[in-house]
A protein has these predicted regions:
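Non-catalytic cap/lid and distal C-terminal segments of serine-dependent acyl enzymes
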Residues: 1-268
Length: 268
């Protein structure tokens, strides 16, 4: 796989930003095992892509630093796009940058222009962990014409409960964090509440992304994942939910990002 760090100006964010990108390319073991890699450079080849979102306190390089996702993706010839979004919850912030607009619309359009990524909905996916799990579902439901599948690992899926202090780590967030996100943190618009957003899309007859969520049985986000699965299922969404032993940590995410990749390819 080819590893690229791409810096560019984002109109949505109104600042320079950085994206880490992994593109399919020959690897040393291909040579050692005698595999034919000429098809990787076929004229007009456009890769399927997975946008991978980080969690709170983190950045776009975390997936590369703490997991083997680059190696896992090599098997599927899948491009990985890993943006940085600070502690934005991937929303268009009240006092801050418009990360939802950036992730759901500007970034895919930019990536497809600069790199050989497919512009087909069925070839474009998004996933994330913790805050990024929420961001992945939010982006996919905001722009279902772009993303055909979305996956969440240990997702912080209940934004209203989170902002009301119903999760233990909210007290650890920076001062004025909530005020930067929303004008009124106790009155979150439906466009940022996943069940409400999903219900609105379903009522409008919109095409919906297929959803996958996975959570550890010792994870503090487990109740929120249980509730979202029940709500999404009741709305008729195509949703799969897996629970495994584990907590809110990289051991869980490194293991179960492999499940996400298998699900994307219909192997799960």
């Amino acid at each position: 796989m080819a590893l690229i760090q791409c810096g560019f100006y984002s109109d949505s964010l109104q600042k320079n930003t950085t994206v880490h990108l992994v593109l399919p390319s020959p690897a040393p073991d291909d040579l050692l095992c005698g595999r034919d890699t000429t098809a990787l450079y076929a004229d007009g080849r456009r890769w399927q892509s997975l946008y991978l979102l980080h969690g709170s306190y983190s950045g776009g390089s975390d997936w590369l630093r703490y997991t083997n996702v680059e190696r896992y993706a090599q098997r599927y010839h899948l491009a990985l796009v890993m943006p940085s979004a600070e502690n934005s919850r991937y929303v268009d912030m009240y006092r801050g940058e418009s990360y939802l607009s950036y992730i759901s619309r500007e970034l895919p359009a930019f990536m497809r222009t600069i790199f050989p990524l497919s512009d087909r909905r069925e070839d474009t996916f998004i996933a994330g962990l913790s805050m990024g799990g929420y961001g992945a579902f939010l982006a996919a439901l905001t722009a279902p014409e772009t993303f055909s599948r979305a996956a969440s690992l240990s997702g912080s899926l209940d934004i209203r409960g989170f902002l009301r202090g119903q999760q233990p780590h909210i007290s650890k967030m920076p001062r004025n964090y909530l005020r930067a996100l929303f004008q009124d943190p106790m009155n979150i618009p439906d466009e940022y509440d996943l069940p409400s957003l999903l219900a609105g899309r379903a009522a409008a007859g919109s095409v919906l992304p297929r959803l996958y969520l996975s959570c550890g049985t010792e994870d503090f986000n487990l109740p929120a994942n249980d509730r979202f699965y029940e709500e999404a299922s009741a709305l008729g969404a195509s949703v799969r939910y897996d629970k495994h032993p584990g907590g809110h940590d990289w051991d869980y995410w490194d293991t179960h990002i492999k499940d996400v990749l298998a699900w994307l390819r219909g192997e799960l």
